Amino acid sequence: LCAENGMERAVLARELSIKDIKTICSNTDTEIEVFIHGALCVCYSGQCLMSSLIGGRSGNRGRCAQPCRLPYKLTDKNGRDMLAGTDAGQYLLSPKDLNTLEILPQLIDAGVTSYKIEGRMKRPEYVAVVVDAYRRAIDSYLAGNYNVPQQDFENIEQIFNRDFTTAYMVSRPGRTMMSDRRPNNRGVMVGRVVKLFKGENKAAIKLEKKLSLGDGLEFWVKVGGRVGTTVNKMTQNGQEVTSALPGTQVVIDIPNGVRMNDRVFRTFDAELMAYAGKFYGEKAKRRITVDAVVTAKLGQPLTVLLTDDEGSTGFGETNFITETARKHALDEAAVRKQVDRLGTTEYVL
């Protein structure tokens, strides 16, 4: 009915399986769009009113305050904690993030037209890294050689993750879909504390991944949760270095509370952020060449016709008529200077 009234594309709910999606695609001419990456809602799509009731912000209007990321207890009618003594975390309503890189070919084969990446309230570097990886993956499949470089998997994990799941795409995962121990970015494990320097607030870290100056770290301490720091200085064998490779040890400054054998997670990757920064901003903006035809005839409005490389056009005219100049007549240089004032748009004359 919607298609008969002009709807061209439908966005499917996240609760559908690939089999469901394929069935829908094969029974409609409407373009189908699906979510392929990012945050998941613990409720059926459109059915959660928690944010509206708790925070006065409607999730159905794109303003969800994510109360599902808060800690909760599961109690019986007598107030008894039903999960006491189990391995369940306290973030009982917090799902992992959706990641479909490994099953993307199945979605393409199912007939999906558009692939939706959840990025509400995310930083631009997140958008850049995730779109970069999925664009490359889709292009490789269409070229007949599907391949996702290991670096793309690592970049997506590093930029933001609550651990990953394919949600309902392949199966009904139950509790394994939940990130009940951590509701926000968990980062990537880069090493362990192997030595503490008493009285110096320094530690030696045995690295499992490359570490660079500017990286943000979290120590998952045995007592007190997590403490963080930024790597502003690190040494190897007494010499200052700007980066260090997996398998080596570095000495860095640490916050209070760090213990031996604590795991070290990187939550901010300075090199990855610099890479992502190349995808946006003025230097990275796509430039579209346009031709301009300016026409001025006495007694008529001055008109401007713009045409880009793909043949798209834009037309405008003044609300005054052209008159004979009293002092300085317009010449080509003056007209070009004015037309070339395209500001921060992506167009260039």
Give each language-model segment a name.
Residues 3-349:
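Surface-exposed amphipathic alpha-helical tracts and adjacent flexible/coil segments at the periphery
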